[in-house]
């Protein structure tokens, strides 16, 4: 059975941010950004919400509901076929949510800005599936849904680990050069492109 994919409502965007934080909580990248496990889910949820709230203006946020009606999967895409508008009050909002870890988030932004492709594309910023619903094809369904809509427009993403890389390769993404890029503490991300 194919899952029903729908646009997230504006009211759901904080829930999407929290879902991304929960599904990414095991990743070394999140641990690098917020080393304190007691604060990580809150800070990362706020960070993902900050970015997710901007996506409907210049991209899209799609979700899948679980059997109980809660969100179990989400994809956050940005349309980079034209110049993307800045997030209003981004610096102030980032400083407020990141607190003592603000330098880590600045390093992340600098890394991603430096290595982001210039060719027109759609950027898969986040693909998240609730831990209780992973390995059921929901992430792939979300990717397929947008890939079909792109009409041959390329797509880009930053993968976080070997499992992600294998998944994205199955959906037509290839390694870019440079492939791995690193935070100052050597935490890696992996650049991938789908033509």
Please provide the spans of the model-predicted regions:
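Conserved active-site alpha-helix within GNAT-family acetyltransferase domains
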Residues: 140, 152, 161-178, 184-185
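Conserved GNAT acetyl-CoA-binding A-motif
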Residues: 120-123, 149-160
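A short helix-loop-beta-strand connector motif used in the catalytic cores of GNAT acetyltransferases and
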Residues: 45-63, 117-123
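Conserved GNAT-fold acetyl-CoA-binding loop/helix
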Residues: 27-49
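Conserved beta-hairpin
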Residues: 57-75, 128
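Conserved acetyl-CoA-binding loop-helix of GNAT-fold acetyltransferases
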Residues: 129, 135-148, 170
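Conserved N-terminal entry element of GNAT/NAT acetyltransferase domains
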Residues: 1-14, 22
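Conserved acyl-donor/pantetheine-binding loop and adjacent beta-alpha core of acyl/acetyltransferases
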Residues: 74-130, 134, 183-186
């Amino acid at each position: 059975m194919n899952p029903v994919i729908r646009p997230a409502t504006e009211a759901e965007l904080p829930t999407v941010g929290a879902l991304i934080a929960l599904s990414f909580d095991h990743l070394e990248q999140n641990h690098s950004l917020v080393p304190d496990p007691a604060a990580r889910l809150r800070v990362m949820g706020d960070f993902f919400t900050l970015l997710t709230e901007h996506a409907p203006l210049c991209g899209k946020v799609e979700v899948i509901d679980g059997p109980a009606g809660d969100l179990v999967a989400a994809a956050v895409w940005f349309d980079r076929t034209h110049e993307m508008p800045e997030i209003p009050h981004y610096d102030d909002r980032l400083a407020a949510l990141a607190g003592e870890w603000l330098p880590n988030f600045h390093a992340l932004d600098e890394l991603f800005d430096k290595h982001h492709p210039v060719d027109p594309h759609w950027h898969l910023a986040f693909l998240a599936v609730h831990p209780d619903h992973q390995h059921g094809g929901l992430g792939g369904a979300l990717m397929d849904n947008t890939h079909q809509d792109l009409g041959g427009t390329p797509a880009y993403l930053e993968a976080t680990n070997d499992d992600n890389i294998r998944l994205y390769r199955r959906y037509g993404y290839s390694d870019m050069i440079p492939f791995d890029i690193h935070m100052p503490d050597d935490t890696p991300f992996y650049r991938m492109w789908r033509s």
